């Protein structure tokens, strides 16, 4: 036993002597360097927009968030865009269920409530809506997974004696293509899509009720995903801004709405297929920031490379959430409950 202990002691001594005072070997391989950040969309940052994607921690690959420069065309602005590579992320719509403008008891929800339900990384308010007699109504197209949840309202009147039948704007996806157009729902089985609007005006007599051949030859409207609103801002790379033809405003104070600055929301697509969700702050929530006119909104989206773009519900409805956090200050002071939202999600 004593012999074994002696041998063990000698071995330990030799071992310690062999390493005492000897430095550990140097690491022969350099530490791996983090790759340098490469801006994915320099055409956007070259316009003065700032990439703020790094402020968010859980965005899936394919989504970028950008903040506008302090001014656009001399106008003080606060605007944000979400840029989506649709090969990596998808866009979708959530809405109350009112496919025939008959109303529903479905509740309106704030974007934050939609976020709580979906955990979608990006959510923006969608189309027009209204509430009356204890029911909620869609006034704009809403389609998800090929199922219709809302149609564009198909009538307009100032006195409920003279009736107009406007075609109103839509942004839709079908067979991998995303574009704008104008729709009319007949009140029955027919839902028409047009490449041009009926050129109605409050200052003129009503045009005929849209059908398969008026205002231009129609196709059946059967998209996979769609959101309505209006006016159409861009089509085929050109500014449209068809607010008068779509009959959003009539006599009175609202006449100035298209040319006044307000919070705005829009959806568009570039010639390279990037989806852009746009929102701008307004109504003095930040000192000196009034918002944008339709024309200014169209110009901003065109400068960002959009070739198709649709204005969505704005004003107090305008709200863009990223990871559930507000970007602009909403003009109602708190988020408005809305009828529909557009969201981005990982494919």
Predicted regions: what is each one?
Residues 2-9:
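Sec-dependent signal peptide recognition
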Residues 13-15:
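C-terminal motif of bacterial Sec signal peptides marking the signal peptidase cleavage site
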Residues 17-188:
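Zymogen propeptides
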Residues 77-81, 168, 228-230, 261-266, ...:
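Short glycine-rich loop/turn motifs
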Residues 85-88, 131-132, 172-179, 234-237, ...:
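Short acidic-glycine loop/turn motifs at beta-strand connectors
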Residues 132-252, 256:
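Active-site-adjacent helix-turn-beta-strand microarchitecture at beta-sheet edges
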Residues 133-161, 242-244, 248-308, 317-347:
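Conserved, well-ordered active-site substructure
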């Amino acid at each position: 036993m004593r012999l074994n202990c002696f041998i063990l002691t000698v071995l330990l001594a030799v071992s310690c002597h062999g390493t005492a005072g000897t430095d550990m070997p140097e690491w022969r391989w350099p530490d791996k360097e983090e790759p340098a950040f490469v801006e994915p969309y320099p055409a956007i940052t070259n316009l003065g927009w700032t990439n703020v994607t790094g402020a968010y921690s859980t965005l899936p690959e394919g989504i970028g968030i950008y903040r506008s420069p302090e001014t656009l065309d001399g106008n003080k602005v606060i605007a944000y865009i979400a840029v989506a590579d649709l090969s990596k992320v998808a866009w979708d719509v959530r809405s109350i269920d009112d496919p025939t403008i008959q109303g529903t008891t479905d509740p309106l929800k704030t974007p934050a409530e939609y976020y709580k339900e979906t955990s979608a990384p990006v959510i923006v308010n969608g189309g027009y809506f209204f509430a009356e007699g204890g029911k909620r109504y869609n006034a704009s197209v809403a389609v998800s997974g090929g199922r219709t949840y809302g149609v564009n309202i198909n009538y307009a009147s100032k006195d409920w004696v003279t009736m107009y039948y406007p075609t109103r704007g839509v942004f839709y996806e079908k067979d991998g293509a995303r574009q704008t157009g104008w729709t009319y729902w007949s009140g029955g089985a027919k839902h028409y899509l047009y490449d041009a609007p009926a050129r109605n005006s409050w200052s003129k007599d009503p045009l005929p009720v849209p059908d398969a051949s008026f205002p231009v030859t129609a196709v059946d409207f059967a998209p996979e995903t769609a959101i309505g609103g209006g006016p159409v801002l861009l089509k085929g790379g050109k500014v449209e801004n068809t607010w008068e033809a779509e009959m959003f405003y009539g006599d009175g104070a609202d006449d100035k709405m298209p040319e006044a600055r307000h919070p705005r929301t829009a959806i568009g697509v570039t010639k390279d297929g990037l989806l852009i969700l746009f929102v701008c702050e307004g109504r003095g929530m930040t000192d000196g920031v009034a918002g944008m006119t339709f024309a200014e909104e169209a110009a901003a989206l065109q400068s960002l490379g959009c070739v198709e773009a649709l204005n969505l519900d704005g004003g107090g409805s305008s709200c863009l959430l990223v990871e559930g956090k507000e970007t602009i200050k909403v003009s109602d002071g708190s988020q408005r409950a809305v009828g529909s939202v557009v969201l981005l999600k990982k494919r």
